[in-house]
């Protein structure tokens, strides 16, 4: 919690924003909204932070929370006391530097069947005959660094 000053209001707003944006989680945003938005304020669905989080997650093709390969760092870059009305009301503004890294790698099984013909020097895809029936496709899965296999040059 920050002091009962206009600057304290700016700092509190920055802390609220950072706590929601760093988590990029709809459930976390709901908890913060419940704790820090007064009754009669914007509803959870109308709250700009909820809209920002859901837009990020939708754009990143993630679920209700960012996945473990996604990193979000938030740093306050500026603050402004835009207005005050007595000691208890402040129009506070914050500028945040938000950096996100999304690291996702996918591995796919792919099958290729070709007639191969020895040319006297090497095997090449044969020119004659119909293409053989292809194998069934396989499903996609995430690739981890330990699952990468070396490949030889063609």
Protein language model regions, located:
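Soluble periplasmic/extracytoplasmic beta-strand elements of cell-envelope proteins
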Residues: 12, 91-93, 124
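Core segments of small alpha/beta cavity-forming domains
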Residues: 1-60
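Surface-exposed, charged secondary-structure patches
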Residues: 59-100
